[in-house]
Amino acid sequence: MKALVKKTDHELIQLFTDGNLEALEALVIRHKDKLYTSILFLVKDKYLAEDIFQDVFIRIIDTMRSGRYTEEGKFLPWAMRIAHNLCVDHFRKVKRTPTIRNSEDKDIFEVLNFTDDSAETVMMKRQSHHRVREMLERLPEDQREVIILRHYADMSFKEIAAATDCSINTALGRMRYGLINLRKLMVQKQIAL
């Protein structure tokens, strides 16, 4: 397994299609945090996020086994697009529009690992994250989605554009206006982060 960690996504996919199940496990481990975090922000329910996360990898496995995977070097954006589409499908089924929110029962910022900080530092970080989360909720959905995908899922603007089905310039514009609006909210609330 240690040898697989150093392989590229493309190499892992090739190994998996040749029958190496550990290669798939390495892919899951490599990308699970970004995928799960993005899904959780979209659906706001940790159990639903886990279900969708599993569905994403079921689709990935089916596609790779059938030989239809062709996006060399673009595994994560492709997987994020599948996750986004499955979230949209879920909301269509329940006749709701997709929203991006954090989970009430599991703080999404808990997914981000803190270093061995003191209890006071951890508490201050949690308070800051809570304030940012409250301000993110006040942003328009399209701006909130781009900020979340950029900062918490660590996606490039090209990947964000592919995942949200918009142009790179549109994603950049949403990010710009989202950050401007966040700054305005910080000034209004007199918050320094």
How should each PLM-predicted stretch be described?
Residues 14, 18-21, 95, 109, ...:
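Amphipathic alpha-helical segment used for protein-protein interaction
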Residues 88, 131-132, 143, 149-152, ...:
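DNA-recognition helix of helix-turn-helix
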Residues 66, 81-102:
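Arg/Lys-rich amphipathic alpha helix in sigma70-family domain 2
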Residues 3, 17-25, 36-55, 168, ...:
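Short, charged helix-capping/linker segments at alpha-helix termini
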Residues 17-18, 57-74:
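Sigma70-family region 2
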Residues 1-14:
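Extreme N-terminal regulatory/targeting segments of RNA polymerase sigma factors
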Residues 51-58, 73-85:
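Structural recognition of an alpha-helix C-terminal capping motif at a helix-to-coil junction
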Residues 28-47, 63, 136, 181, ...:
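Amphipathic, Lys/Arg- and hydrophobic-enriched alpha-helical face
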